[in-house]
């Protein structure tokens, strides 16, 4: 009996060590899958130079043409800080991040059509890291599109200060949220045409109902409710309150952000809303991905 107990005691540590080694092996495989899929999205982003150029040109056209036109239509304040282009600049940053980040989900749809996704699914890797790597790659690509636009902030009177580094970090979080939404749509949509239609229907309403083009406060009735419920409203307002210079909020009281009664959310609270959106979208996408494929 004593001999048997001694044998069990000596067998337990090797079994525990084997379990720990197995967990480390699974973690290493998951991290490797995340890194490979992240690199894949980044390489795809770097090779498509025409798309990079067009994604930068379109937001700048909105800023210089649409923004300048509305700047002439908005009544000027008494000071010299009233510039609608500076107010519109956070929306332009959001526009630069939005399209490429949400389009990252298209890679999942095309991989499903080409059969590459099936090869990923039979690999000895859990499925959540597959979506996480794609989301991180899409967020990196979206940040790469927004960086040239951010460098042109001086064109609308926004000074180059260290606060722009905080804006860059906020854009990274916003890009990850957009990519998570795009991945969620891609997991639910089985065909490329369906994905493109859904993304096209979602992008513009999300942008225009986020306070990017007009102030989020003081809106009438149902419109104010819809804008307040849009998570991207808080992303735009966080960018607007972080960007340096008075010109960003130079429309006076009309440039106030979203409010819930007498409470105005702080910038960390607004970024928390964006983080919750990203986490929910990625969680639902992972659940659907595990059940549908």
Where are the predicted features?
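Junction motif at the cytosolic side of a transmembrane helix
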Residues: 2-15, 243, 260-293
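Short hydrophobic, aromatic-rich alpha-helical segments embedded in or entering the lipid bilayer
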Residues: 3, 32-36, 214-259, 268
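Aromatic- and glycine-rich beta-strand/loop motifs that create alpha-glucan
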Residues: 11-58
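Short helix-coil transition/hinge motifs at the ends and kinks of transmembrane helices
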Residues: 22-24, 73-82, 246-265
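Short amphipathic alpha-helical coupling elements at transmembrane boundaries
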Residues: 36-44, 115-122, 190, 200, ...
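Hydrophobic alpha-helical transmembrane segments of multi-pass membrane transport proteins
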Residues: 59-68, 83-156, 202, 207
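Transmembrane helix segments
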Residues: 66-72, 160, 186-237
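Alpha-helical transmembrane segments and their short interhelical loops
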Residues: 127-200, 204-206, 266-286
């Amino acid at each position: 009996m004593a001999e048997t107990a001694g044998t069990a005691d000596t067998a337990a540590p090797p079994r525990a060590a084997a379990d720990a080694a197995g967990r480390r092996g699974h973690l290493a495989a998951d991290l490797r899958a995340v890194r490979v899929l992240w690199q894949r999205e980044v390489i795809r982003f770097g090779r498509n130079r025409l798309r990079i150029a067009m994604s930068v040109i379109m937001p700048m056209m909105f800023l210089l043409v649409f923004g300048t036109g509305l700047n002439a239509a908005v009544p000027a304040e008494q000071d010299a800080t009233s510039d609608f282009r500076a107010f519109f600049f956070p929306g332009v940053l959001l526009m630069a991040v939005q399209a490429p980040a949400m389009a990252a989900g298209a890679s999942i749809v095309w991989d499903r059509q080409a059969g590459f996704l099936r090869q990923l699914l039979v690999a000895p890797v859990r499925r959540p890291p597959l979506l996480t790597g794609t989301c991180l790659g899409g967020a990196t690509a979206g940040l790469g599109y927004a960086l040239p636009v951010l460098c042109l902030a001086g064109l609308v009177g926004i000074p180059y200060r260290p606060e722009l580094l905080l804006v860059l970090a906020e854009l990274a979080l916003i890009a990850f949220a957009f990519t998570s939404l795009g991945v969620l749509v891609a997991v639910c949509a089985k065909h490329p045409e369906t994905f493109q239609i859904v993304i096209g229907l979602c992008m513009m309403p999300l942008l225009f109902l986020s306070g990017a083009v007009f102030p989020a406060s003081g809106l009438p009735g149902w419109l104010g409710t819809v804008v307040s419920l849009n998570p991207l409203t808080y992303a735009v307002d966080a960018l607007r309150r972080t960007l340096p210079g008075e010109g960003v909020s130079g429309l006076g009281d009309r440039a106030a952000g979203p409010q819930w009664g007498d409470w105005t959310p702080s910038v960390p609270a607004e970024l928390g809303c964006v983080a919750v959106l990203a986490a929910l979208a990625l969680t639902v996408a992972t659940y659907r991905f595990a059940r549908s494929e």
